[in-house]
């Protein structure tokens, strides 16, 4: 593809090589006036078997500005478990890491965990457990960890479906002062006729 309306000519070359069924190699080049400014290359694979699907993308991105970015993306989807991962690095320096897991292997409950990490910006961890009588969620977020204004936010919430009660706590400076917190304890009723949840 060419874009002649620009002061420079921009070309995109994209090749998909079929290695085998559901396995490919991707090569993409962006060229400006015969000079390569971006190159993307790597395998893409997918596997489907036994009510489960997996796919994996492993790309290397290089540019005229120097350095390589490694992008790894993987996912697994099944009735029992779901996982989603992104891992990006500049050379050996981490840029972005995301890992989300939902586990349904225990018939009595569902668990979920998530990690989101942007170095020097935020590292956040979330968790949840859901069963027939209780929904428990928690979080642990560390913001600007390498700076003087670093702050950790921690908290949890319990929704007791059997007793119709809610309990929650949020610490907004958990790293330095455990007394800086908000607490909530309340009960609720469900009015099915009005389709409302009433907080007491």
Where does each model-flagged region fall?
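Beta-strand-dominated lipid-handling architectures at cellular/organellar boundaries
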Residues: 1-200
């Amino acid at each position: 593809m060419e874009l002649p309306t620009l002061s420079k000519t921009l070309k995109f070359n994209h090749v998909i090589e079929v290695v085998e069924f559901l396995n490919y190699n991707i090569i993409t080049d962006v060229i400006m006036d015969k000079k390569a400014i971006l190159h993307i290359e790597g395998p893409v694979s997918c596997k489907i078997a036994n009510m489960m699907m997996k796919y994996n993308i492993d790309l290397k991105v290089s540019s005229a500005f120097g350095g390589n970015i490694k992008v790894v993306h993987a996912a697994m989807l099944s009735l029992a478990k779901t996982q989603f991962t992104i891992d990006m690095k500049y050379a050996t320096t981490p840029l972005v890491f995301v890992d989300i897991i939902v586990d349904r292997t225990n018939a009595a409950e569902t668990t979920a965990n998530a990690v989101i990490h942007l170095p020097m910006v935020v590292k956040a961890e979330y968790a949840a457990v859901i069963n027939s009588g209780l929904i428990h969620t928690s979080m642990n977020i560390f913001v600007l960890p390498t700076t003087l204004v670093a702050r950790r936010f921690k908290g949890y919430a319990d929704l007791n479906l059997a007793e119709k009660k809610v309990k929650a706590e949020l610490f907004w400076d958990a790293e330095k002062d455990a007394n800086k917190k908000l607490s909530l304890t309340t009960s609720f009723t469900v009015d099915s006729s009005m389709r409302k949840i009433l907080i007491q």
